[in-house]
From Swiss-Prot:
Residue spans of biased composition, Low complexity class: 583-596, 899-910
Disruption phenotype: Mice lacking Ush1c display abnormal brush border morphology along the length of the intestinal tract.
This protein's name: Harmonin
Main localization (coarse): cytoplasm
Keyword line: Cell projection, Coiled coil, Cytoplasm, Cytoskeleton, Differentiation, Hearing, Phosphoprotein, Repeat
Coiled-coil intervals: 299-377, 417-482
Domain PDZ, first and last residues per copy: 87-171, 211-295, 752-839
UniProt note on tissues of expression: Detected in stereocilia of cochlear hair cells (at protein level). Isoform 1 is expressed in the eye, cochlea, vestibule, heart, kidney, small intestine and testis; it is barely visible in skeletal muscle, liver, and lung and is absent from the brain. Isoforms 2 and 3 are expressed in the cochlea and vestibule.
């Protein structure tokens, strides 16, 4: 029981107190209390930590840790927090007013609290207390109201209805910059000049007074001795307590003062009368003050020891308090430093503004001074304009005519006009020189002004740059660093993934006639760490468990793979007639079989610049839609200048074939069909069929295609930002997931296990195949349809193994169980579904395809959908062709040597 209480107390402390130093201080205070057993000191120390309303439940959590004899005193010293609301009604029109003051509001980040009551007023008379939190006024909640809105709400009605609950704390905030603090009611009243109450100081008699009940029936006596106090300290005191007696059981100790017995006051009672009262009754109700006269009965040695212990405890408590409050001091210092820094920035900005203003004033003064000097030297502007007009009037060209007329009219035998013209010329030259000098000075002045304006603009620009640099916060710098780290991580991830893919491709050896080797295992990347949210309830869309081939609604197509570009062939016609059918050899029939067979290639010759393509058409008559579907898939071979063609790249698994070597390629020989058994008649249920791998001729050398630089879409989706899925705050694979926390090392076995969180929008559109009871031995993704939630997420592709769904491991599930679990997880509530997948490495063809149902001939659309996946595929020297009923693996050599060999049919479709 004690361990359970201690564990619950620690959980509550961890939940309510975030600062580790304050937690340590709280535990040290409790440790010191169990050494000193002083409740008043304990409560005083606890109030330093429990200094917020949300931490008040710690007082109730500490109460079970207090011994029973101290719990009454503990309850008196701690604030009594009421859980129930109290409703009172006040008359707003009362002559004395409401009789209360409130503080707080939404703008201060706290509720509304009563901070002062007028003694004898309305609020005091109805039982309101200082430290009550006002919850409702006139029926309206005020949790989101400002102080002014609360005052206006009180004024709306004559009778004010108030609901309160007692907290015992009052918010304190001296200035807008200061953080909100809380004070207990007794501390607040004491600082305001009132009488301190409720703290329980050691000298206060009422706080240490307690009552004990003793029944003397069946006992020999009280088991204690009493003594009268000296003159300076009168009273009746317990001088000795026998061990194991009734007095020891009820908690009486040496030095306790007896204040009252059965209603009789012992404060001024005589010693004999006190003895008679204690002996007169067999049932006693005794009120005592613990330790009031302990010093009267202590020896000198005990006094010295107690003083030494008190000093040690005081030093220890001071040290613990100092350590506990160190974090608060550091926080205050940081706040002070931040305030000082802001003040310095503001001061520097003010100094810059003042300096800028002084510089501008100085520039304007210099301009005024220069203008005055210039006006003194050259006169006002109006006088400057006048000589210009005079020079224009005395210009010799326009005044030539009237002057000649005046000369002719005043002629008196002399020629005064010649002298007159000379004087006017001299005057015009003098004026032009004056104008040139003035224009030069004006030009110099304008240049000087222009330079000063440029300097002023440069200074303004520099000031703005400095201010902007100062205003850049540390958060923005951290965001910049974080974005750079993210970009670096994405580049590293892409580079690592490209290296893994290239290494996996380089490990594939050149093959001539043998079967393709198994795909190289890609070493999984170290999975990012994140806890898997197992019990999440998520939102839903039905999954179609019935095979799509049984109905004639438009099928959902898998998500489109990227088309690999090819240069247009000059000699390739739009449609080429069907290749000639080869004669049957051995057990192979060629006339009416839908199976394709390649003839031996011609003698190797250098590849032409453009290789003609051939269309494959079935020899058996089919509907026009099927002919069109099968006729639009040309056969092309790679050459050194072109990547792998579309037909060879688009295998059923969606991964292009590539080879690390570059060799010459030859045009393909005509392809024919080999025989196959007729499909069994029955209901149109799809069955699994496997590809027939027909071996090439013994003299045919397979030339691998040139290594394609275009990566499959699934690998691009895993590596880089693809489509719209990688927008801001989007993660394709969840971080922090540890696969070894869910699976054993044998289950992981080198797989790249990742956690995907897919948002439930629309339908999931994810098809599964395999199962623990299938040849595959695991649940894998067979198709990801366009427009579904899985395709929009982009983290799951065809071939991935499903290992867990919403925390449930499905590695040992059958296909039906896995589909049911996936449908149930999608139908549950919530917004997300969690899938744990093992990423499929680049591999050869190993998927399964559903067979063509018997109803395909009746529906051209359905037949086209089924036969689109039955195209022949060339992989590493093998020729793969899909059969409607089963999948066969044949080599041409085995056909010729062992006629009794027959392919085994595949397992039924799960």
């Amino acid at each position: 029981m004690d361990r359970k209480v201690a564990r619950e107390f620690r959980h509550k402390v961890d939940f309510l107190i975030e600062n580790d130093a304050e937690k340590d201080y709280l535990y040290d205070v409790l440790r010191m209390y169990h050494q000193t057993m002083d409740v008043a000191v304990l409560v005083g120390d606890l109030k330093l930590v429990i200094n917020e309303p949300n931490r008040l439940p710690l007082f109730d959590a500490i109460r079970p840790l207090i011994p029973l004899k101290h719990q009454v005193e503990y309850d008196q010293l701690t604030p009594r927090r009421s859980r129930k609301l109290k409703e009172v009604r006040l008359d707003r029109l009362h002559p004395e007013g409401l009789g209360l003051s409130v503080r707080g509001g939404l703008e201060f980040g706290c509720g509304l609290f009563i901070s002062h009551l007028i003694k004898g007023g309305q609020a005091d008379s109805v039982g309101l207390q200082v430290g009550d939190e006002i919850v409702r006024i006139n029926g309206y909640s005020i949790s989101s109201c400002t102080h002014e809105e609360v005052i206006n709400l009180i004024r709306t009605k004559k009778t004010v209805s108030i609901k309160v609950r007692h907290i015992g704390l009052i918010p304190v905030k001296s200035s807008p910059e200061e953080s909100l603090k809380w004070q207990y009611v007794d501390q607040f009243v004491s600082e305001s000049g009132g009488v301190r109450g409720g703290l329980g100081s050691p000298g206060n008699r009422t706080t240490k007074e307690k009552k004990v009940f003793i029944s003397l029936v069946g006992s020999r006596g009280l088991g204690c001795s009493i003594s009268s106090g000296p003159i300076q300290k009168p009273g009746i005191f317990v001088s000795h307590v026998k061990p194991g007696s009734l007095s020891a059981e009820v908690g009486l100790e040496t030095g306790d003062q007896i204040v009252e017995v059965n209603g009789i006051d012992f404060t001024n009672l005589d010693h004999k009368e006190a003895v008679n009262v204690l002996k007169s009754s067999r049932s006693l109700t005794i009120s005592i003050v613990a330790g009031a006269g302990r010093e009267l009965f202590m020896t000198d040695r005990e006094r010295l020891e107690e003083a030494r212990q008190r000093e040690l405890q005081r030093q220890e408590l001071l040290m613990q308090k100092r350590l506990a409050m160190e974090s608060n001091k550091i926080l205050q210092e940081q706040q002070e430093m931040e305030r000082q820094r802001r003040k310095e920035i503001a001061q520097k900005a003010a100094e810059e503004n003042e300096r800028y203003r002084k510089e501008m004033e100085q520039i304007s003064e210099e301009e005024e001074k220069f203008k005055k000097q210039w006006e003194e030297d050259w006169g006002s502007k109006e006088q400057l304009i006048l000589p210009k007009t005079i020079t224009a009037e005395v210009h010799p060209v326009p005044l030539r005519k009237p002057k000649s007329f005046g000369w002719f009219y005043r002629y008196d035998g002399k020629f005064p006009t010649i002298r007159k013209k000379a004087k006017e010329k001299k005057k015009a030259k003098y004026d032009s020189l004056q104008d040139l000098r003035k224009n030069k000075k004006e030009l110099e002045f304008e240049q000087k002004l222009y330079k000063e304006k440029e300097e002023m603009l440069e200074k303004e620009k520099q000031l703005k740059i400095n201010r902007l640099a100062q205003e850049v916060s540390e958060t923005e710098r951290e965001d910049l660093e974080e974005s750079e780290k993210t970009q670096y991580w994405v580049e590293r991830l892409c580079q690592t993934r490209l290296e893994q893919i290239s290494s996996a491709e380089n490990e594939i050896p050149e093959m001539t006639t043998g079967p393709p080797p198994p795909p190289p295992s890609v070493s999984p990347l170290a999975p990012p760490l994140r806890r898997f949210a197992g019990g999440i309830h998520l939102h839903t869309t039905d999954l179609d468990d019935i095979p799509l081939d049984m109905f004639y609604y438009p099928p959902k197509t898998p998500s489109a793979l990227p088309v690999m570009p090819h240069p247009p062939s000059v000699n390739s016609p739009s449609k080429v007639p069907a290749p000639p059918v080869l004669p049957s050899s051995g057990h192979v029939s060629s006339s009416s079989s839908p199976w394709v067979q390649r003839t031996p290639p011609p003698i190797p010759i250098p590849p032409p610049p453009s290789i003609p393509t051939q269309d494959l058409t079935p020899t058996r008559p089919l509907p026009s839609a099927l002919e069109e579907a099968l006729g639009n898939h040309p056969f092309r071979t790679g050459d050194p200048g072109h990547p792998a063609d579309d037909w060879e790249a688009n295998t059923h698994s969606g991964k292009p074939s590539s080879s690390p070597t570059t060799e010459r390629s030859f045009p393909p020989a005509p392809k024919t069909f080999c025989p196959s058994p007729q499909p069994p008649r029955g209901p149109g249920v799809s069955t699994i069929s496997k590809p027939v791998m027909v071996h090439q001729e013994h003299n045919f050398v397979y030339r691998p295609a040139v290594k394609s630089e275009v990566l499959p879409q699934e690998m691009l989706k895993r590596m880089v930002v693809y489509q719209t899925a990688f927008r801001q705050d989007f993660r394709k694979y969840e971080e922090g997931f540890d696969p070894y926390s869910m699976f054993s090392p044998e289950q992981i076995a080198g797989k790249d296990v990742r956690l995907l969180r897919i948002k439930k929008e629309g339908s999931l559109d994810l098809a599964l195949e395999g199962g623990v009871d299938s040849p595959v031995g695991k649940v894998v993704v067979s198709a990801v349809y366009e427009g579904g939630a899985a395709e929009r997420h982009g983290g799951v592709v065809k071939g991935d193994e499903i290992m867990a769904i919403n925390g449930k491991i499905v590695t040992d599930y059958t296909l039906a169980e896995a589909e049911a679990a996936l449908q149930k997880a999608w139908n549950q509530g919530g917004d997300w579904i969690d899938l744990v997948v093992a990423v499929c490495p680049p591999k050869e063809y190993d998927d399964e395809l559903s067979s063509l149902p018997s109803s395909a001939a009746e529906s051209p659309q359905l037949a086209r959908k089924q036969l689109e996946a039955y195209e022949p595929v060339c992989r590493h020297g093998f020729f793969l062709q899909l059969e409607p009923t089963n999948l066969l693996l044949k080599s041409r050599e085995r056909n010729q040597t062992d006629p009794s060999w027959r392919p085994a049919s595949s397992a039924p479709s799960p």
